[in-house]
Amino acid sequence: MVPMASNNLAYIKLRLLSLLVGLGIAALASLIIYAVAYYLFGIYSIGIIFGVFVLVLMMDLLQWFIGPYIVDMVYRAKKADPNRYGNIIAIVEEVAKLNGIRPPTLYISEVSFPNAFAYESPIAGRRIAITRPLLGILNEDELRAVIGHEIGHLKHHDSAVIMAIGLIPTLIFYFAYTTLFAGDRRNGGSAIILALVLMVVSFLFNIMVLSVNRLRESYADANAALTIPNGARNLQTALAKIVRYGSSAKNTAASMLLFANYDMDREDVETLIDKWRTMRVGILSDLFSDHPHPAKRIRLLDKLQDSS
């Protein structure tokens, strides 16, 4: 890896680490504020706080454990038949070897839009799903780059990271909701104010979690660019093709799994890439998205391509 590529990757890591530290500090500050409110106003019971924490944790763990099976049902994904998809399985094994991890299991998703996603759990193991339309629009090199992106998610344990930090806004929201009913009636006004403050804090935490997710996507893009031969360029054309052929995935809870979640007009692939290179993208362009704006992804890949 040449120095410039190392610098680009180090910058992404530093931003991600800084944001995670910020989340931790903010979470600690929220707990301190809540403890002070409890001490001054007696708004909350420690037993209820513990109960809410255990309930949310159990719900998240259950979702993590059985999530892949739910994803398989929603996206109609089935384990790839080696006799039919042996060449794709071979690419997955090749890319996994380049990344130094055990090959994940390949699944084929029978949905109408082109995309790919990685998912895992301690029970289901590591999986990569590719939708059938994606196989029809990407060449082998582009498919290899997309798989490099998805394996990057698995290598960096992104599902576990997002699940862990996603606990914070969920917990704060439940604390806010139950504060309205668990406080001393003499402090009803204080309870309402505290609940509203906590709901705002929960919303802000969700924005931060989305930001972390966008950085994980950039990190996965960098993984493909730096571990797959000509990965940056092939990932650019793959992204453009996916958008050009109309990904219908929206910003839903499941869309965080996907390689891309933007709908745009049909344009020539190269024209679209050039458009993204020069597009002015504001800070609010992807504030509520779990994926970076395509223009940001293309520019990052340009930097990685130039430095490789």
Curated annotation (Swiss-Prot):
Record GO terms (molecular function): metalloendopeptidase activity; zinc ion binding
Enzyme nomenclature, EC number: 3.4.24.-
Main location: membrane
Swiss-Prot/TrEMBL keywords: Cell membrane, Hydrolase, Membrane, Metal-binding, Metalloprotease, Protease, Transmembrane, Transmembrane helix, Zinc
GO biological process: proteolysis
HAMAP family named in the record: Pept_M48_protease_HtpX
Entry protein name: Protease HtpX homolog
Source species of the chain: Thermoplasma volcanium (strain ATCC 51530 / DSM 4299 / JCM 9571 / NBRC 15438 / GSS1)
Upper classification of the organism: Archaea, Methanobacteriati, Thermoplasmatota, Thermoplasmata, Thermoplasmatales
Gene (name only): htpX
